[in-house]
Amino acid sequence: MSSSTLSFKVFDLDFPAGSRNKTATLVTGEREALLVDAAFTRADGHRLTAEILDSGKTLTTVFVSHGDPDFYFGAEVIADAFPQARFLATPLVIEHIKHSYDGKLNAWAALGPNLPTRLVELEPLSGDLTLEGHAFQLKGGPAGLPDRHYLWQAEHRALLGGVLLFQQEHVWVADTPTPADRTAWIDLLDEMTALHPDLVVPGHRLPGTAADASAITATRDYLTAFEEELAKAPDGAALTDALVQRYPDNGMLIAAQIGAKVAKGEMTWG
């Protein structure tokens, strides 16, 4: 156990472009810094770079917690600014990024110069991260959802939930198309709750929402509601309408639209 105290600063960044729904977290100790997730746009990569520089700390590690573009498209800018920093991700996330990168560039071509120009080399992480002697346990990744992890810092009771947690957003379910996938997700949420965290950072949130365990409850409630409405809705459009009716103030409508179509077999997502 380290004698230093860690500070956690959460940023609300673009996803989709123009909507601040994606988080990144800068963790700083006495001398060093850890960044969790690397933004969706080059512009936000520059914003994170400025925050790291202003912190006065040495960036040692960037952890890319998931393989979707809003977790890593901004990494190139950060890597150029901090060439000594290591960029880490789990092996399955690295594999997913390598296979999907070109397709994602095409899908988000409207970003233009805000798109990355290259992939940053990611080193495989299979165990825990450390910052000045503080361990960040890599948890999750069960058989049913092997590419989904979160970080747990026990001394500060801090949980960085990544793609598993949403706060006042429509939950992105397009990548968990089966009931078994979503049941495995709920099991992970129950595992998080059992840790009794104080600080909880969801991967996606509306700015201004609380960084506490209510994000776990909100995500779990939404997944339960999704199953209820899925059973009743005749098609994807009806399912989206039902979700919007239940959650009128949630952001990321696109998640309810695409997730409903995928769950109803009207489209595939990969």
Tell me what each language-model feature is.
Residues 27, 126-131:
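Short acidic-hydrophobic surface loop/beta-edge motif
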Residues 3-54, 150-162:
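Conserved beta-strand hairpin/beta-sheet module of binuclear metal-dependent hydrolase folds
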Residues 36-38, 60-68, 88-91, 159-162, ...:
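Active-site neighborhood of phospho(di)ester-bond hydrolases with catalytic His/Asp-centered motifs
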Residues 96, 194-199, 207-270:
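Accessory terminal helices/loops
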Residues 40-41, 135, 142-143, 148-217, ...:
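Metallo-beta-lactamase
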Residues 53-128:
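Active-site HxH/HxHxD metal-binding segment of metal-dependent hydrolases
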Residues 27, 37, 52, 66, ...:
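Divalent metal-coordination and catalytic microenvironments
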Residues 4-13, 108-111, 130-135:
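Short Pro/Gly-enriched beta-strand edge/turn motifs at strand-loop
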